Amino acid sequence: MIVTDASFWVSALLTQDVHHGDADALLRRIAVEEIPVIAPTIAIIEVAGALIRRTKDPRAVEKSVRHLQLQPGLTLVPITAPFAEAAAKVAIASSLRGADAIYLTLARQEGLPLITNDNEILQRGAPFASVLTPTEWLRQNPGTEA
């Protein structure tokens, strides 16, 4: 089981993204091996915002967001008031943006690795949870393909 952030999903969904290859490879592994994935509900909003800024294509973005929400094995976790308080503490301690602290807090509370391509999370997240790029996760978890 893993936690994913918006940067992972954007890389997986946009073929022109510099990290698309490994993000797509991980997404295929998730599907084939039925790896459970969790993400906070804010991921939907962040993915939509990032995609529209990069593509300027509202229809394509809406389709991508629907595709994200229908991913098998993906559980979207709502943000409660106690969770928000915990994430605020992580934001303060790490100097991360609020949304980034939400992903990190979810990974910390669940005891799971956070898969991200976000440099700030990669640089500042380690004291709170295991933080890996898709490339690192794939390297640490070789597939069983023949």
Which residues does each predicted region cover?
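Residues that scaffold the ATP/ADP-binding catalytic core of kinase and kinase-like folds
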Residues: S11-L13, A50, R124-G125
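Acidic, PIN/NYN-like endoribonuclease modules and their adjacent C-terminal/linker elements
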Residues: M1, L76-V77, L104, R108-A146
